[in-house]
């Protein structure tokens, strides 16, 4: 619990320094008998230069029916290269997953492509995530596609669909709001 409090405090402190903050709501539907959940996420991002961005975030999961809680705290680094309206990116991240019965570290790698036309940006990516210790059974592959619309230069809304396979099987519908500073 102390680690969760420290991570949350670090995230809130980071809000004062972030170039953008994203709030996201997720409706996760379990596949093949897996439980549904309602999730909320907050992420703070800061550009290091034109190619590199760092982020820190936390996601809270609430399982339908049981109301069991789990949390993922994660930090990542994204490299991106724009080529006209098309961009390619690769994100690497590490984090901790907390539940009422376990706590373990994990890593993820996500390559993808973006395409921007005016205020609309489409994104397609593939994420591989696994626990540092294979015994924790957290190996997943996520195929994702999303679109965002820049309402103003500082405000954007987005929608994303994720399909997760592996040790977890689900799909989710995700709505987000991003405020840039």
Indicate residue ranges for each PLM-predicted region:
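Outer-membrane beta-barrel proteins
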Residues: 2-181
